[in-house]
């Protein structure tokens, strides 16, 4: 019986064709050819990476900004010279800047890498600021520090930079919004505590401020200082560098936190996607390999005062002229952006300072502070300020709603993001694809993230004391010998021998053995034969890769568990704690900064002043007070209500944003101090004209409606406000004399 072949047979895949031609060996041959070609192309990418590294370091001002920039201030020309500079980012073609919008100033981290990551691509912190119409400035740095420069010198230079930005934008509707990434975040917070008048809203992304914080079973990086015996090793490394600390060691420390990615995944992604992955990989490696140096004084301050000493939140850092760095002095709203997927700055380290400084939310309010935080579920440390998706969502919403954040009443909020849809109430009032809602929180919400108990605090305090002892011993007995042996040529040689730098150098054209790779890669590209995706050997390759990652992750988990157990056991020893001057039985907080008695007296004086102002004001003050009261029942603020409220600035007298912010805060505090008196005073603040009161109440209802379906509590509060405004249940106006209870006073 003959079998007739159909003219409409399904097309054969490459793997099936190979099987037909070579039998069972076909897929194996295809895979072998592809693997050989990928190997050549992979090593050529590594060669390009090495050449790129050498070219980048040869630049006068190496950076990875994807925008054109013009120098405004060179920090090397200041009275206390530093290697920092202020540049203006030139808006790209097609970007329109509103001269009345507050400028954004982005401070990049100097933590081993060069500057520019905040403007690495279009979808970045710079990009979203431009999209929202803001002028944008950037604070960067050179690879080599100025002789003798200190962290305080850098802070003073950044103050000069901000003064210049403010002077360049006299018509802006607010002080600059300053973004600090990673190390740049804590540096910005220190400056804001000393010079609060220079700042608008502050956004700190992936920035540690509470360096001991964390939870057991995670966050092992915080144990490093204790396990190494303290900061003496930092001093030794600086001495071996001839008075400079090679930032490549910081980069290597980051890489050690994720051995699977460092040793395998990063390279495997290039190898397995060799035809498409190279440009993205090389673009990032340009930043990752752009190492910079720090002075010995700078890195020693960072390690001693911050990472081991944990003195920032405790208020124990002082400037050279004796001014204490107290984060409670910051008057601007603080936005904290962190992630559960960040193993460098976990949420506990980004937010723990709030628990260190304040007893409760009322304590935050008494300092006049507004703190907004948001926690991403998965993104890693670099993704917080590199990821395009994060830039479009979180950073984009921060930029679009920066005025809303600036006018939030004091307190603690969490920024929650919801996708905007056609069914979103008031969608036309929402800019972008997301609705950012600021929900009121308490300190219990921060505590729920987990953290240290009293025993953990004693362990870290003991490690800090031991670090001081070991550093003193090193400086007394070993440092003079090391410095005598390490001449400038020796220091330079040791710097070139740093393991990460060797990787870049050896896989570049500087190595004659790499010379044939470029020609071989060119031939491969001409005759490229990628394997089919359904080849069984590709599936085997993926399986092996996953097993390697799992093995490396298992090794990491094992070593981290051993490190944690060692730290907890050694520094939990009552004998060692007693020897270090730490009482093993003490359960009191070790790092609570003292209350400023003068400040407390000023707070009480301000409360009395606000109480006396409760009956004062006119229609504008009454409407704002009523809006705040109705919104307090909802427990959240979002851009829809704010966009509606913004119109009040023109309807009831155009107020500058700074004055509008003051008005909102004063009315909010009055409601907190004495809600009953504040509400009872509303009728006396309203005009006698029924139509004016009716229109004002319509505005309040419009704001409530813009924020979505009102709750029962919202309806109750709105009804109460309606009664006070003289509006009956059916919208009828109550005769003014029937609602006027408090004698009018001058505005």
What kind of feature is each model-predicted range?
Residues 144-149, 156-175:
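Conserved acidic catalytic loop of the alpha/beta-hydrolase fold
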Residues 195-259, 363-365, 369-378, 382-402, ...:
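A catalytic-pocket lid/entrance helix-loop region that shapes and gates access to the active site
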Residues 59-145:
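Short, surface-exposed "cap/lid" segments of acyl-processing enzymes
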Residues 583-747:
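Small-residue-enriched hydrophobic alpha-helices in membranes
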